[in-house]
């Protein structure tokens, strides 16, 4: 890997590092809430998942950059421009989810992000098939995190929906 590869691999981590530094105390307290869905992974697993995803997508972007000749010419505008947009949306999700605790807004941005990642993979596929395939775990991880965001958003709207009703009663 060329030295530029290290930059591409490190770049996706800048947003999460900055968000973490600015919101560390709120993130730790948030993760201790008892109403997380049962499938929500422990904090360390969630953190390791995101670190891995960011490394992989950084490497994938490097492959695309390298296969299009390096530099920052016109052929890179769409493939890396779209990647930059989805990276920015990904960082915004962190702010909405962890700092603002706006789970509905985070969920909407995750759905937008899902579409952006699929679009990025489709554009990258003719350039570098491995780069496109490397985005698939990101889509899987987004599915998990979006389901957590949905669960938390739903619970914030209807906090008692998960409590059992007495025998014979139905919810409205």
Swiss-Prot record:
Alphabetized GO MF terms: 5-aminolevulinic acid transmembrane transporter activity; cholesterol binding
Membrane-crossing residue ranges in chain numbering: 3-23, 45-65, 80-100, 104-124, 130-150
UniProt membrane topology term: Multi-pass membrane protein
Tissue expression per record: Expressed in erythrocytes (at protein level).
GO terms classed as biological process: 5-aminolevulinic acid import across plasma membrane; enucleate erythrocyte differentiation; import across plasma membrane; intracellular cholesterol transport; lipid droplet organization
Protein localization: Endoplasmic reticulum membrane; Cell membrane
Transmembrane as UniProt keyword: yes
Pfam family name, one: TspO_MBR
Primary residence: endoplasmic reticulum
Superkingdom, taxonomy of origin: Eukaryota
Keywords (A to Z) from UniProt: Cell membrane, Disease variant, Endoplasmic reticulum, Membrane, Receptor, Transmembrane, Transmembrane helix, Transport
Region forming the signal peptide: none
GO cellular component: endoplasmic reticulum membrane; mitochondrial outer membrane; plasma membrane
Domain notes: The C-terminal region mediates cholesterol-binding.
Family: Belongs to the TspO/BZRP family.
Annotated function: Cholesterol-binding protein involved in the redistribution of cholesterol from lipid droplets to the endoplasmic reticulum. Required to meet cholesterol demands during erythropoietic differentiation. May play a role in transport processes at the plasma membrane of erythrocytes, including regulating VDAC-mediated ATP export, and import of the heme precursors protoporphyrin IX and 5-aminolevulinic acid.
Pathology linked to this chain's protein: Defects in TSPO2 functioning alter the cation composition of canine erythrocytes so that they are high in potassium and low in sodium (HK phenotype). Although HK erythrocytes have a tendency to hemolyze they do not cause serious disease, but the phenotype may lead to misdiagnosis of hyperkalemia in HK canines and blood transfusions using HK blood may induce hyperkalemia. This phenotype has been identified in the Shiba breed.
Subunit structure: Homotetramer. May also form homodimer.
This protein's name: Translocator protein 2
Native source species: Canis lupus familiaris
Lineage, uppermost ranks: Eukaryota, Metazoa, Chordata, Craniata, Vertebrata
């Amino acid at each position: 890997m060329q030295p530029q590869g290290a930059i591409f691999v490190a770049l996706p981590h800048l947003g999460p590092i900055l968000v973490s530094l600015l919101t560390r105390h709120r993130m730790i307290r948030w993760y201790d809430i008892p109403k997380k869905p049962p499938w929500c992974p422990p904090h360390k697993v969630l953190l390791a998942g995101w670190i891995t995803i960011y490394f992989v997508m950084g490497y994938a972007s490097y492959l695309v950059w390298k296969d299009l000749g390096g530099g920052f010419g016109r052929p890179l505008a769409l493939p890396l421009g779209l990647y930059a947009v989805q990276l920015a949306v990904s960082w915004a999700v962190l702010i909405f989810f962890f700092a603002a605790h706006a789970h509905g807004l985070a969920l909407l941005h995750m759905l937008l992000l899902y579409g952006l990642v699929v679009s990025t993979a489709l554009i990258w596929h003719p350039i570098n098939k491995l780069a496109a395939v490397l985005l698939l775990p990101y889509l899987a991880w987004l599915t998990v995190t979006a389901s957590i965001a949905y669960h938390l958003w739903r619970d914030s709207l209807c906090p008692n929906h998960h409590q059992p009703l007495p025998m014979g009663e139905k919810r409205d």
